[in-house]
Amino acid sequence: MASNHPAFSFHQKQVLRQELTQIQSSLNSGGGGGGGGGGGGKSAPGPSGALPTCSACHKMAPRTETPVSSISNSLENALHTSAHSTEESLPKRPLGKHGKVSVEKIDLKGLSHTKNDRSVECSFEVLWSDSSITSVTKSSSEVTEFISKLSQLCPEENLDKLIPCLAGPDSFYVERNHVDLEAGLRFLASAPSHTLKHDHVRKFFSSSSPSQQLQSPSPGNPSLPKVGAVMGVSGRPVCGVAGIPSSQSSAQHHLQHSASTSASLPHCSHTGGTGSALAYRTQVDNSPTILMPSSLQTPQPQEQNGILDWLRKLRLHKYYPVFKQLTMEKFLSLTEEDLNKFESLTMGAKKKLKTQLELEKEKSERRCLNSSAPSLVTSSGVARVTPTSHVGPVQPGRSSSHASELRVEVEPPAHQLPREGSSSEYSSSSSSPMGVQVREESSDSAEESDRRVDIHVEGTEKEKPVMLLAHFPSSSARPTAQVLPVQNETGSSPAAHHPLPPQLMPAASHLAPVRMLNSVHKSDRGGADVKLLSSSVHSLLSLEERNKGPGPRSGTKVDKSFGGAVLDPLPSAAPHPPGQGLSGLVENNAVSPTVSFGPRAKVVHAATLDRVLKTAQQPALTVESSSATTGTPSTVLHVARPPIKLLLASSVPADAAIAGQTSCPNNGQISVPPAIMNPRTALYTANTKVAFSAVSSVPVGPLQGSFCANSNTASPSSHPSTSFASMASLPSCPAPSSSPALSSVPESSFYSGGAGSSSPGNIPASSQSHHHHHHHQQPPAPPQPAPPPPGCIVCTSCGCSGSCGSNGLTVSYANYFQHPFSGPSVLTFPFLPFSPMCGNGYVSTQQYGGGSAFPVVHTPYNGSVTPDPVLGGQSTFAVPPMQNFMAGTAGVYQAQGLVGSTNGSSHKKSGNLSCYNCGATGHRAQDCKQPSMDFNRQGTFRLKYAPPAESLDSTD
């Protein structure tokens, strides 16, 4: 019967069949050897040896426990659940001796299907009025007759109405019979005491037909071992065949046996009918029965819901009871053969299930392949990068002073899915934040898909693949490019930067996000673990992993993407010159990003990121800038000696304490060039949880440098590429101006309409040679101070370096993005002329005070007006209140026509003020008496747009 029980999987049924057959045969053959030998060789006799038996007594002999080794274990494994059998400690009443007692309670303990699956056997545990307990097994037909008779004897119970179908069990489907039978059984379990005391009930449960007697089949088998009485959680026997536990047994003396001990229980059996509740029944068909205890531990509810949902999708949820006992894993691994075992399934259902399960298996296989092989990413072009200057395995060289040049061949995918985050999306009007909202909404699914692509590659000594993975997420995942060095250089060797051959450029110009992975291979000096970081940076790259080995090694990861803001790294610990930091400028334009290295901040083309500055002073260096598809321009920078963890990530809530503690002792400064922030995403998205918390703990001097860029220029050669930041150093910094320098060469073609189509032809060779400098500096030598370039003068009108006569402002980012924004702060009204969404695509520079937690941006106009907190103060907009961020004469967020004067104290006259809450003019939203609107409802924005003041330029 167990072989047909729907509660068991195919494998469980097979194991059960084998085990039970062995037990049955061993019981029949080796019965005379006492309790310990009852297992027939499978269980060794315990310390007590053969247990005493007394064939004449009707009471149980005192318990002497003998551990049974393998029978119970195998059965327990077959059932995949542990349970606790407590019933053996209860007084067992010999069958047939119930003349003076009545039934107190009936518990249903299990249903067993016979081979034809038509009849069901029910096992009951009966508590008698003298506190004895017996176990009775009856067939469903007997139970049906009993309940129908009981309904005649006790007409007031309305049993016939309760179970109208029990009279003709064969005229209904098995499922229907089970339902009806269960209704009757439930009634028996909850029957009132006067019904249970009825003579008919007493006779029914005190008599037993020979095939269902619970006594031992022959007097020559006096002691029957209890198999599988394992103490567990549920208080139920797992594998006692007719094992019926009792809930009243907690007071009994047998509860002290340990969780994994199996007890072999001697039973005094008598031919007259004394028997143990745990004795195996002799089946007419000789197939052993297993009774499922009612509290058999079922799989987790969520797994159950998973199966149910899965079946619902196929419109097969009515068959859910068939698979109820399976886990999701087992359910999905069912084969056609297994499905054929379920006789209650129709042919159509089996066929449908078979097809869907095969599809599911293919999907999971594909997923496994994806997670094990980094090159198998759905809809991705794969590029193989071969190191050209190495013949053997690529290993970190001890004394080699050259960097191997990498050749990249990109095989673009057959079809590129239209994806958000492509350059065409960013070339739209910079004043439309609608795209930001869409990107933000899809970023959750993006993180899901990214997590799937999170691949951990362990570099081994034998392998030397260098892979470039062009990742094209269809759901606006934050695609990234990661470059890891193929070689380590010791501190004495100068670092050379070789550009990638231009084959990469055609790919890069329209492949947009690229994921590059150059696996670093371990050598005896220790290598680096290569991680293909999922760009949902929720899995922190732990630098301890990268620094387990003894020798200096360098793993540099550049996670490049669109909308990447740039951070200068912290240099290594104080004994070393702090100027050895890498300043990586990962630009938004895929055509020509630039990277600057070293204290002198030489500009290097982004194609050379395969060779980054690696010195002994910087054992691990990682730059990662995740894509703006989540709405945040960001750069993640790890620079640390082995004990240090530093992570600055836009999509990760960074640990401020860790970052703060590690940044200050390292004498490092972090500067962020404002011109590279994506203006549409810097302020308004929920994912702008830019956790630059380390920056807030590092004193940063004014950022000097010149930015000049026009939004219609696509060629990087037209921009000054040598503007760097000369940072004021910390007091403990040995060489002030040698702190990490920043290359600020924004490629504004990222924002131009032609950014998506800007071709590598725009990068002249002269521009490339102009970008690349080889920097040779011996570590012992004191760092040479970089000459401070002209101040960071940015024209607030056109973005030029100040030649048009407008005033500019120097910038100091002291507390840059200290706290993440709260809530989904997407502004969905593109008709407001908010300057950070305009202004040639650049967020103008600004000075941030010590307490400012958010960046505020200057208006593109130089009018003497002050910020009206258009975005602040109301809970309707989850944007930080901008009034708190005034620092000196720094302009705060200024919107045209809605602002006052720069001293930050007075507002414009109220005639031009407009309340975005009620739509009226003359007061601000902070003073509005109307209840604030629900920002999530579409179409409720009631703004009466006030025309811009005459003093401002009317072209914007």
Swiss-Prot record:
<dbReference type="GO" id="GO:0008270">
    <property type="term" value="F:zinc ion binding"/>
</dbReference>
<feature type="compositionally biased region" description="Low complexity">
    <location>
        <begin position="206"/>
        <end position="225"/>
    </location>
</feature>
<feature type="region of interest" description="Disordered">
    <location>
        <begin position="78"/>
        <end position="99"/>
    </location>
</feature>
<feature type="region of interest" description="Disordered">
    <location>
        <begin position="361"/>
        <end position="464"/>
    </location>
</feature>
<feature type="compositionally biased region" description="Low complexity">
    <location>
        <begin position="246"/>
        <end position="265"/>
    </location>
</feature>
<dbReference type="InterPro" id="IPR037632">
    <property type="entry name" value="ZCCH14_SAM"/>
</dbReference>
<keyword id="KW-0862">Zinc</keyword>
<feature type="compositionally biased region" description="Low complexity">
    <location>
        <begin position="423"/>
        <end position="432"/>
    </location>
</feature>
<feature type="compositionally biased region" description="Polar residues">
    <location>
        <begin position="369"/>
        <end position="389"/>
    </location>
</feature>
<feature type="compositionally biased region" description="Gly residues">
    <location>
        <begin position="29"/>
        <end position="43"/>
    </location>
</feature>
<feature type="region of interest" description="Disordered">
    <location>
        <begin position="243"/>
        <end position="276"/>
    </location>
</feature>
<protein>
    <recommendedName>
        <fullName>Zinc finger CCHC domain-containing protein 14</fullName>
    </recommendedName>
</protein>
<keyword id="KW-0479">Metal-binding</keyword>
<dbReference type="InterPro" id="IPR036871">
    <property type="entry name" value="PX_dom_sf"/>
</dbReference>
<dbReference type="InterPro" id="IPR013761">
    <property type="entry name" value="SAM/pointed_sf"/>
</dbReference>
<dbReference type="InterPro" id="IPR042344">
    <property type="entry name" value="ZCCHC14"/>
</dbReference>
<dbReference type="GO" id="GO:0035091">
    <property type="term" value="F:phosphatidylinositol binding"/>
</dbReference>
<dbReference type="Pfam" id="PF00098">
    <property type="entry name" value="zf-CCHC"/>
</dbReference>
<feature type="zinc finger region" description="CCHC-type">
    <location>
        <begin position="913"/>
        <end position="930"/>
    </location>
</feature>
<dbReference type="InterPro" id="IPR036875">
    <property type="entry name" value="Znf_CCHC_sf"/>
</dbReference>
<dbReference type="GO" id="GO:0003676">
    <property type="term" value="F:nucleic acid binding"/>
</dbReference>
<feature type="compositionally biased region" description="Low complexity">
    <location>
        <begin position="750"/>
        <end position="768"/>
    </location>
</feature>
<keyword id="KW-0863">Zinc-finger</keyword>
<feature type="compositionally biased region" description="Basic and acidic residues">
    <location>
        <begin position="438"/>
        <end position="464"/>
    </location>
</feature>
<feature type="region of interest" description="Disordered">
    <location>
        <begin position="206"/>
        <end position="229"/>
    </location>
</feature>
<feature type="region of interest" description="Disordered">
    <location>
        <begin position="485"/>
        <end position="505"/>
    </location>
</feature>
<feature type="region of interest" description="Disordered">
    <location>
        <begin position="543"/>
        <end position="583"/>
    </location>
</feature>
<dbReference type="InterPro" id="IPR001878">
    <property type="entry name" value="Znf_CCHC"/>
</dbReference>
<feature type="region of interest" description="Disordered">
    <location>
        <begin position="25"/>
        <end position="50"/>
    </location>
</feature>
<feature type="region of interest" description="Disordered">
    <location>
        <begin position="750"/>
        <end position="786"/>
    </location>
</feature>
